[in-house]
Amino acid sequence: MKNIYGALCCGLALLAYGCATAPESEAPAPAEAPETPAVQEVQEVQAAPESKASVTTKFFAKNKLGQIVMQYTLKGAGGVVMDVINYGGKVVRLYLPDKNGESKDCTLGFNDVAGYETVDPYFGSIIGRYGNRIANGLFVIDGVTYRLPTNNEPGGIPCCLHGGAAGWDTKIWNAEPFQNGDNVGVVFTTTSPDGDQGFPGKVEAKVTYTLTPENVWRIEYEAVPDKKTPINLTQHIYFNFNGEAEGTILDHELTLCADKMTPVDAGLIPTGEITPVAGTPFDFTTPHKIGERVDTKGDKQLEYGNGYDHNFVLTNPSKNGELAQAAALYDAKSGRYMEVWTTEPGIQFYCGNFLTDKMVGKQGKPYQFRGGLALETQHYPDSPNQPSFPTTIVQPGQVYKTTTEYRFGTK
């Protein structure tokens, strides 16, 4: 599986300190999702004639409430295979071929629901209703103060992280697998009630995963509230191109199409500034190994995050709904390569600074500090409290809609 994007997108565009934009791909139009199937037998969506792609459904586990969790295996015609579940829309496994055609699982996660219900750092999850942090769990809309549960205290400063302790990553979503030619995927839907985790308004949400024959994993987010409410959806998949639980990601080379960032305070809350990355360890406008500068002494931003855990502002963000390149990731040893394209204005780069050996992965091996990284497309953290940031307040009846693609290949 050779890289089909590199020369066009990263080879030329990034060397010129910029990123290209591309038209948003057309996604299949899935049917409305039914209730979660209460079955345990394997089911297979009818494959298209002569297609190498397929979707298989099977029982995964029951959660602590006794609810059934189903697994959907998306086998792409281009060689990528994904196992996803309807508990939080989590990606449990992601098999990526290397430069020799050998596939490995390259994402962090657990073999059972119990792992996700106890020590899970959002592995592979849909994040909502608000991805990233909201300072002190407070925000104001039209003079009304809304109080959210605080579930994170970096630097001893409380915040609401990723939608609260019972965010959308903990929901059993309705799920409908589909196949449209060589495109395979799952449509996840859920209803978040008014007052869910303290947020105002009922929200009808739909997240569509599509795996294409070009080895593109497309995520389309849609949400419609009935009251003004902040919405900021993302995916929290962790990557390690060495393979799951196989060392750290410090030798991975990262490029970010971002010449600015939003610096944070000791609580990892943005200060409201947007500052250039030039001349700092945060300058990834050209490729750098993640371990090259992550422990730079005297850099307050790295000290606050115990490494990289920051929002980067895209240099050339999406216009008119077109996808813009946000990042590229490369592992020279395996040859695995990925690009991230999005309609969002920012991307959170997190290099696994809070992973510990208390988290035991799918191979029975403990995860290492910095044993995985996340590239989360998003609006900026704490936007409801930062008037200078692009707004995340969605109006009643307004359709919130964003798209992100993870494009996999080798070189």
List where the protein language model places each region.
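C-terminal motif of bacterial Sec signal peptides marking the signal peptidase cleavage site
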Residues: L15-G18
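Bacterial N-terminal signal peptides that target proteins for export
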Residues: M1-L8
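An exposed, glycine/acidic-rich loop-and-rim segment of catalytic or binding clefts
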Residues: P23-V80, N86-K411
